[in-house]
């Protein structure tokens, strides 16, 4: 049976959105590679936004240009940008594989089968959200290169919102868990193999979302600390506390809502733990530079975040295994039980 008109239109729109996402990925990838080389139009190295080793307070008071707050070191920034680029590549590969699978299995007797497959795999709205993620991330890196920390903080907040929306869309497609499970049962049999691929993609995006939560706290407070007069130690504590509050809120939402759609959601908690561990190294440099007596308190706060993340990992593992081993109980036959009562 030929595809319906609705399926044909949705498939073409979806294909155009995937092509746009692929072109945006190529643009962002070339940009992220070019920004690492000097004399290509970028004034500063984006990864040296807070290089404490390059600051010499005894000569020319170089710190007056920008207040150096708590931030991750250049190596961590480069690794973060590189991993995000690899995640973008993985998502593009996922969409291309899904598109190829749908095209190879669009001949079916079911009406609007292609539309149901596209909706469950990742529809046009998720593709354009993915484009917004890449564009806002590119804007964030550009702002760091130009030392516009306030603009960089704003761009990263927009990126984080888009990243969160994309994760929620990829998991739920903005429908109830019952409708999502029903749509999963109705997808084409040839697409069953992409379910595991989608689960891997979701967990990796959740992992980077957890690490990006830490990045959100330190980037936002870096912009605030360079926009208004505020003590550096207050900015440092605000960064960690923002990370803690946001991570707890996201973890509760995952355990209360999102696990009804995808059971093995461990990625965010792992990223949360990696963020706490990764931020501990800059704190040691921060202590050496400022000779701060507050570093112990900062480390304790990070330890609390790490313990909470481990607790959520254990909680998710226990709930996943218990749910997996749960079996249906045999229903009691009310008619036979009533007959037995009468005989007695």
Swiss-Prot record:
InterPro entries: Herpes_glycop_M. Its main location: virion. It comes from the Viruses. The chain crosses the membrane at residues 13-33, 77-97, 126-146, 148-168, 204-224, 239-259, 264-284, 294-314. Keywords: Disulfide bond, Glycoprotein, Host endosome, Host Golgi apparatus, Host membrane, Host nucleus, Membrane, Transmembrane, Transmembrane helix, Viral envelope protein, Virion. This is Envelope glycoprotein M. GO terms for cellular component: host cell endosome membrane; host cell Golgi apparatus; host cell nuclear inner membrane; membrane; viral envelope; virion membrane. Residues 1-12, 98-125, 169-203, 260-263, 315-344 are intravirion. Residues 34-76, 147, 225-238, 285-293 are virion surface. Envelope glycoprotein important for virion assembly and egress. Plays a role in the correct incorporation of gH-gL into virion membrane. Directs the glycoprotein N (gN) to the host trans-Golgi network. Signal peptide: none annotated. It is a multi-pass membrane protein.
């Amino acid at each position: 049976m030929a595809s319906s008109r609705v399926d044909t239109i949705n498939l073409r729109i979806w294909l155009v959105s995937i092509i746009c996402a692929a072109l945006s990925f190529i643009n962002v990838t070339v940009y992220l590679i070019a920004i690492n080389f000097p004399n290509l139009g970028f004034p500063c190295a984006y990864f040296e936004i807070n290089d404490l080793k390059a600051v010499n307070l005894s000569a020319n008071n170089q710190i007056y240009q920008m207040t150096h707050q708590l931030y991750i070191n250049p190596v961590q920034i480069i690794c973060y940008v590189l991993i995000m680029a690899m995640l973008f590549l993985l998502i593009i590969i996922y969409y291309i594989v899904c598109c190829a699978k749908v095209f190879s299995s669009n001949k079916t007797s079911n009406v609007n089968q292609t539309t149901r497959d596209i909706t469950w795999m990742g529809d046009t709205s998720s593709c354009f959200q993915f484009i917004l993620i890449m564009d806002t991330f590119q804007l964030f890196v550009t702002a760091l290169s130009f030392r516009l920390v306030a603009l960089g903080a704003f761009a990263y907040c927009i990126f984080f919102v888009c990243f969160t929306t994309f994760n929620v869309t990829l998991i739920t497609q903005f429908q109830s868990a019952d409708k999502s499970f029903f749509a999963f049962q109705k997808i084409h049999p040839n697409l069953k193999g992409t379910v595991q691929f989608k689960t891997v993609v979701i967990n990796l995006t959740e992992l980077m979302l957890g690490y990006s939560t830490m990045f959100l706290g330190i980037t936002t407070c870096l912009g605030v600390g360079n926009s208004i007069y505020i003590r550096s130690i207050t900015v440092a504590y605000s960064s960690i506390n923002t990370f803690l509050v946001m991570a707890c809120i996201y973890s509760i939402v995952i355990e209360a809502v999102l696990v009804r759609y995808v059971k093995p959601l461990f990625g965010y908690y792992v990223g949360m733990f990696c963020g706490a561990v990764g931020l501990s190294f800059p704190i040691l440099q921060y202590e050496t530079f400022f000779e701060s007596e507050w570093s112990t308190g900062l480390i304790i706060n990070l330890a609390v975040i790490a313990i909470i993340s481990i607790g959520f990992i254990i909680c998710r593992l226990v709930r996943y295994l218990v749910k997996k081993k749960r079996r249906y109980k045999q229903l009691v036959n009310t008619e036979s039980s009533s007959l037995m009562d009468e005989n007695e």
